[in-house]
Each structure stands twice: as structure tokens, then as C-alpha cells.
Amino acid sequence: ALEVGPGARKQILHREEDPFLFFPLPRPNLIVASMWSITDFREDNGATLLVPGSHQWDKERVAKEKEIRSAEMPAGSVLYWLGGTLHGAGANSSSDWRYGIILTYSLGWLRQEENQFLDVPPEVAKKLPPQLAQLIGYKTYDSLGFSINPEYPLEQDS
């Protein structure tokens, strides 16, 4: 979960795809991000800021203030954007906390941002339904090869 507390400053605009420097900007879409609002997202409590179209920009291009949009939405809403889009949390000038959950979806051949092998060790993952274990990375992506067990790593004995 992400939180923006009273008095928080505006976050620096960034891209979810910034770690993937091997593709120059603009690049093919690698990630789709989603922000689920737990509380109302308002301009005064730090609603997510987005720069529409910035996924098509060169790295040197800087957003002008008039290009930045505040994603105001009621609790229970979801916002989707391409991973190359500039975004960040807005400043919170209110007395309210702003809460949200961000989930990102990447191409199957990219390494996940979170290391699920540390968060969910194999002995725990073996007890999960197979589809859930696969979704969190316990199945290698089809077609790239160079892996020990491309079918299902949990079937290996350690």
C-alpha cells in the first residue's frame, strides 16, 4: 500500500519502466500499472499526477506544469497507465491521509520488480494453488530457454 500523509511534498515524476534502461525512450510498452484508491484521491490530498502521452517522449523531455493532470477519483476506483508514463504522488496540503495500492503487470520475460523467491519461499509456494504460484513467478516464461526447468520450478527437489 502507498500512503501520502498531511504535509507530504509532491513526488518527483518518474516512470515504472525506469529500471529497464536497455530500451531507449520512447520504448515499446513493457508494463501496465494500476492504482487502486482506498480513500478518495483529491488534488489537495496528493492524488496521483500523470503526464498523458509522456510514454512517447524522449528521456530529455521535461513535463510542463500545464501537461500534468491530477487523477482525482473516489475510493474504490482504479486508474491504469502505461509504464512509460511520467507520474508521481501529488503534494498533500490537507489534514487527511491518502491511501492506495499499486499493482504493475509486466511482460512475461521481464524479471519481476519484487523478488517473490524472498517474499514467498518455495516451501510456502508449494502449498499455493498452482495458478497463484505461477502468477507470482514460480513458472518461467515460455520461449526464452536457458532455464533449468521451464515447466514448473516448484517440482524440483531442493
Predicted features by range, described:
Residues 8-72, 110-120:
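Catalytic core of non-heme Fe(II) oxygenases with the double-stranded beta-helix
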Residues 57, 61-80, 84-85, 90-158:
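Conserved double-stranded beta-helix
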Residues 1-6:
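Short, glycine/charge-rich beta-strand/loop segments that flank catalytic centers
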